[in-house]
């Protein structure tokens, strides 16, 4: 059976839930990965209003869609981050509160616990998202990092996320971290450290997204192979990395996405540098049968055109694994 092809609604949060569901169906998708921002899925309402979950399920059914995951990247970011003014623009007012760091982190952690509970009520087994990181600002070790600075960051991550993951365990939901710059895990080495910091508990895995590895020169196929049993969700997303030197390198030069001076940028699926044939074969080898969720980003392309072509691209690319050895027919019986 082909894997379901879904659309992540995070980049469509300016549209009402009913509208993006109708569009996703018209684009050819089997379902959606619902963002917990905009009006798409509101965690507080899901837990306080018995009719809210039914209203969401009714809209999905009306359009013949399934929901395979919900995502709460924005609130998750605040759990471990060093909180500053930037977070105010991405957090609900009830999470931001007075903006004091300890309070924001505490409220964000509680919201992630509630996100697991809301996912269970919706009948969803995976929550994708971010963790934030207290040590991301120390990525480039100058002035030199004291020896305990980074290990303390992983300990802080475990202190914040183990209680959250206890709730995930209680309700039978898994958390899938999207390894990404600014998170506790952003490549293979940091992902290994994050898993170990949590004692290798099974409720913590990854929302695999190759686009965030290609511009770092990380082995994005090797990531699947390394964490084959922890790939809980997959983002289909592409990025272009220039083969030639550019004015702004991997760090971005403080210039916006879409600027031609950048060394890399996100592109519609199949138009960047990711080898999706290799990705698909590695996912097959890993036994991944979950959704292939299109996170569509391309600042130079109309998003409806892009979402439609991305759906078709994934369908052409996906294929079932073989149940036989191709050369078995050569044997004499």
Q: Where do the protein language model's features map onto the residues?
A:
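Acidic/histidine-rich catalytic cores of soluble enzymes
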Residues: 3-5, 19, 31, 70, ...
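Conserved, mostly hydrophobic/aromatic
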Residues: 7, 24, 32, 60, ...
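Active-site beta-loop-alpha junctions enriched in small/polar residues
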Residues: 8-12, 35-39, 72-75, 132-134, ...
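Short, acidic/polar
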Residues: 13-24, 107-117, 215-224, 276-278
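Catalytic domains of carbohydrate-active enzymes, especially glycoside hydrolases
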Residues: 18-38, 122-123
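Active-site acidic/histidine proton-transfer and metal-coordination neighborhood
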Residues: 23, 62, 79-206, 304, ...
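Glycine-rich, proline-tolerant flexible connector loops at the mouths of alpha/beta enzymes
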Residues: 35-57, 131-138
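C-terminal helical cap(s) of enzyme catalytic domains, especially alpha/beta-barrels
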Residues: 303-323, 330
């Amino acid at each position: 059976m082909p894997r379901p092809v879904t659309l992540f609604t995070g980049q469509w949060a300016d549209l009402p839930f009913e509208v993006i569901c109708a569009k996703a169906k018209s684009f050819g998708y089997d379902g959606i990965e619902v963002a917990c921002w905009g009006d798409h899925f509101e965690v507080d309402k899901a837990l306080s209003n018995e009719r809210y979950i039914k209203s969401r399920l009714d809209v999905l059914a009306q359009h013949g869609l399934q929901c395979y995951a919900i995502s709460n990247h924005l609130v998750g970011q605040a759990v471990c981050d060093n909180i500053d003014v930037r977070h105010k623009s991405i957090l609900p007012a009830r999470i931001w509160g007075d903006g004091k760091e300890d309070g924001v982190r505490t409220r964000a952690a509680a919201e992630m616990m509630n996100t697991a509970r809301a996912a269970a009520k919706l009948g969803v087994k995976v929550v994708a998202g971010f963790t934030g990181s207290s040590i991301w600002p120390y990525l480039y070790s100058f002035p030199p990092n004291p020896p305990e600075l980074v290990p303390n960051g992983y300990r802080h991550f475990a202190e914040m996320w183990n209680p959250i993951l206890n709730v995930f365990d209680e309700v039978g939901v898994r958390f899938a971290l999207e390894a990404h710059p600014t998170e506790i895990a952003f490549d293979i080495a940091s992902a290994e450290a994050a898993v170990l910091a949590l004692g290798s508990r099974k409720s913590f895995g990854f929302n695999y997204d190759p686009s965030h590895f290609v511009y770092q020169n990380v082995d994005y196929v090797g990531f699947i192979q390394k964490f084959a049993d922890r790939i809980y969700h997959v983002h289909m997303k592409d990025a272009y990395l220039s083969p030639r030197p550019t004015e702004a390198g991997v760090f971005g030069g403080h210039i916006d996405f879409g600027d031609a001076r950048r060394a890399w940028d996100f592109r519609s699926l199949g138009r960047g540098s990711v080898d999706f044939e290799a990705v698909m074969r590695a996912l097959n080898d890993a036994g991944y049968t979950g959704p292939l969720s299109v996170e569509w980003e391309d600042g130079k392309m109309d998003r409806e055109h892009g979402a439609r072509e991305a759906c078709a691209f994934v369908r052409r690319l996906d294929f079932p694994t073989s149940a036989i050895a191709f050369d078995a027919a050569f044997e004499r019986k």
